[in-house]
Structures are given as C-alpha cells and as structure tokens.
C-alpha cells in the first residue's frame, strides 16, 4: 500500500495536468516526487527551498492571482513556523489555499522534536474559516484532497504514515452503536479505538474531518452523557467543539490524544503512541475508567 504522502504527490501531479488553476508550492520536502510535474508545469510547481514563511506568502499571492495554491511540507514547518504568514497572508487577506502536511504528531520520531507537531490543529483553531481533514487511509486522503482542490476556502489536510488497515468513508460515520457512551475516533486512530472498545457497550463515531466538527451526527447518535474524543494530535483539541455541539445537554467529556508533556527520547512512532496512551490497551484502560467513574 502506498503512503498518504505518496498518494498526495501522485494525485496532485495528475491534477496539475487537468486543472490550470492548481499550483503547488514546496519547501524542498517531497520535491523529488513532483519533478516530472515540475518539468511539465514549471510556472505552477514552485520549490522555494527551506523558506517556510515565503512558502505561505507565495501561496497567498498565487491565490490573489486567481490560482488554487497547494502548499506542502512537514506539519511543524507548515503550520507552526510560518503561523504569522498564515494569519496575515491567508486569513487576513481572506484568500483560499490548501495546506497539506506530512509528519503529523510523531511520524518522524527519529527527527526529534523539531519534526513533531501535535499542536497544529489547535493552533489553526485560533483562526476562523479553516476546514481540517485528518484522513485515516490513503484512499480517504485522495478523496479529501480532491475535494479540497475543488473548494474555494482554506483547507488543512494532515497526512500521516499511521493508517487504518482498511479505508473508511471519507466523512463522519457510525462504526458501532452502544448505550454506555460515545467514542469519537479521528483519522488513523480508528483501528486502535475499535480494538480498544471491542468488549465495551459504546457507540464509535469515525471522522476524518474535524473542522467543521461532526456536531449533528454526535447529537443524533448520543445515547449517554459520556463522550470520549480520541485524536492523533494534542489531547483535548476538540473538547470546545464538542461542548458547543452538546450545549444544553448534561455531558461529560474526556479528551485523549498526544499529551503536552515533553518526551526526550527518540524511539519509534509506536513507542510514542504507547507513551501517549493511544495504543489499544491504554485506550481500553482510559475509556473504561472514565465510563465507570
């Protein structure tokens, strides 16, 4: 199976041939995969080198010129480092763009803290008007990327090397129904959540899109006041959105995800998953403890 990042490069390269509005802005990362497309479309495949602030500003300028820019690099260099440019050159100018990241929270664990970005979605939550996709499989990534390229607004697509074994619908979906509570599984954490809740009487909702938050589906399927969010980025990021969705109803919310504590050992992505309590056995303990409290 190809990775989400490989699928992104392949699909986007094909669409550059079909859509004259599409432009790709790179900062070295993944540039080899766009080499052929760059030779075919040298005016719409732009590698700026390791200058991430310029990456975003260039995307804003292309949007002002009527193009649909796609800016890509690792998440920490796409959202965190050039955040001021996102705020000013995209949001303040009110132009659309697609930001496509790789690396996620700890995919590149050997790269150390500089290449880890668990706070990216929370940071974008401080700005209005963003759609945020967190696909759980390359097939979902392709669907969501195609939708993002056809849209007009600001879209963040968060790619990861962590994937579910099988693709799920690229929209909010009920995977399991129960009576004791609701677990919302985001993107690549669907498989760990299903394994963790196999013996629990809970509803499991899956969503590869977290902004806008799937409020209506949550309200329609809620069978008990307990809601557990399992997100592959900073723990609790979607608690405010969940609280707004269930305003006026008695609710208890638990946010599971990447902890804010600093881990100063490299390890593997699997080591980080366990350290943050996102493996099936840890999730089972956390969810069971919350439901029985």
Give, region by region, the residue ranges found by the protein language model:
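Thiamine diphosphate
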Residues: 1-145, 149-152, 160-293
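Short, structured loop/turn "capping" segments at alpha-beta junctions
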Residues: 154-156
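Generic beta-sheet signal
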Residues: 72, 100, 135, 158, ...
